[in-house]
Amino acid sequence: MSLTLIQLVSEQTLQNLLPALALRPGQIIQVKSSDPRFKQTPRHFVDACKVAGLDATDFPLADTIPHDSPDIQETMQCLEAIIARHDKADLALNLTGGTKLMSIGAYRVAAAHGIPSLYTDTQNRREFVDAQTGRWAPFLPCLAEQVQKLTVPMVMAAQGKDFLEDSFTEPLLEFGREAWRLRLDYHEAISAWTGAIRNSLPRRNMRIDDRPAILRQFLQTPLPSTASAAAADYLDAAAQAGLLRVEPDGRAYLAAEPKKSSVERVSNLLDGAWLELAVADMARRGGRFADLHWSVEPEQRGDDYGETDLIAVDRQKLNLAVISCKTSTEHVSTLEHLSSWRDRARTLGGSHASGHLCLFRAKSPAQASDLCAMGKKMNIQVHIAEDIPACFAEPCSGAL
């Protein structure tokens, strides 16, 4: 018997993707309202399933209920028409998506025909909930196993997002770990040295010069030296990661190509983006965040989001985690950043995605308190200083 899964379309993409991964049906029939927000959602869901390897599953055109917000009766009429076209013994219903009225209508139809149905409870991280409308044969799979299969490309494909990214290397992650350790106690001394490097970069019109000859000359010029032992240790860690080249005489040079993007990348990693590597290293050693992606940007120009520091699957919240890393708030409007990050999270992972701000240093305890309060109102989790490893490096207490 080949299972046909009927599901309701809404913004809740994971609640539909997880049952598809679990049941691997021969066919998935999507039922959506006429709400224009969901016009492309069925196509994006198909793309996500293809990314997940459901190549043997058929996806007929979605059935559309001719109303932006269907009531119970309209939903029941649509589902009755679908059931009439199929052998009821092959059908199952996912009640999770759609509006509450659509879910009620779907439940009533499933109960009337004895069709098995389920609800995906991602909020409380339970197993798939058997709605007791029919008998599952043989039984519902384990939700925990499906969560382990989730990847960032799957979740973003369900939102219609393709992306490019940078690549982690073990030396870079080790640099992030060492940078965190050193900067906890010697941030000012190290920042003075990396700031001197930043100020030594060749510039034109306030930006890094993009002329290869100028950049080549800069890369052959020794970087500013430092008398700080901590900064010297930081230099050694950066050299081990391939960010600096140190000659036998002790002079250090930026290890980059004579291209603006390459020089900018290395200098940023030394001065501020080291925090992205530190958080990534913590997340890889912890148990909560899976399938970490770094420096994510749209594959297509003109897409509706910019570069994103880190993206991962949050196994505790069962959603996409969109993570911003800032060493300070010196050049950032905190309210504007939190607001834009909330929008970024929703753009990339849907209405249930969560935003995170990792801040290495706040200006004062009062600012830290204000930031956390603002973040709570905007559904952005703010982690400051030692709160960062508490979230990212610890085992996942609520993981399935």
Regions found by a protein language model. Give the residues of each.
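Hydrophobic beta-strand segments of well-ordered beta-sheets in folded domains
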Residues: S2-Q7, L23-V31, A56-D58, L91-A92, ...
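Short, acidic/small-residue loops that bind anionic groups at enzyme active sites
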Residues: A92, A112-A131
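Beta-rich, aromatic/charged-enriched effector core domains that present basic-aromatic interfaces
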Residues: N124-L164
